UniProtKB/Swiss-Prot annotation:
Source organism per UniProt: Oryza sativa subsp. japonica (Rice)
Pfam families recorded: Metallothio_PEC
Role of this protein: Metallothioneins have a high content of cysteine residues that bind various heavy metals.
InterPro entries hit by this protein: Metallthion_15
Alphabetized GO MF terms: zinc ion binding
Gene: MT21A
Family as reported in the entry's similarity comment: Belongs to the metallothionein superfamily. Type 15 family.
Upregulation: By hydrogen peroxide, ethephon, abscicic acid (ABA) and salicylic acid (SA). Barely induced by heavy metals.
Protein name: Class II metallothionein-like protein 1A
Length: 87
């Protein structure tokens, strides 16, 4: 899998180190691809921050773990509170 706009890379790729993927297979961890930014391909590294150590799936969106302040569209809503019941 290559880097794309979901991985923080410009499309079409302008070339250079800004859009280069590397496989962590070199470190013995199997064939797992990451962007040069260090995030997994297919996961937009939202600039608003990400959960450093997620405790559950409540903040996870398509393999991304977004911080509480994240409102970017690629991460989606991370609000975990249930909607208020209407009476």
């Amino acid at each position: 899998m290559g880097c794309d706009d979901k991985c923080g890379c410009a499309v079409p790729c302008p070339g250079g180190t800004g859009c280069r993927c590397a496989s962590s297979a070199r470190s013995g961890g199997g064939d797992h691809t990451t962007c040069s930014c260090g995030d997994h391909c297919g996961c937009n590294p939202c600039r608003c921050g990400r959960e450093s150590q997620p405790t559950g799936r409540e903040n996870r969106r398509a393999g991304c773990s977004c911080g509480d302040s994240c409102t970017c569209a690629s991460c989606g809503s991370t609000t975990t509170t249930a909607p208020a019941a209407t009476t």
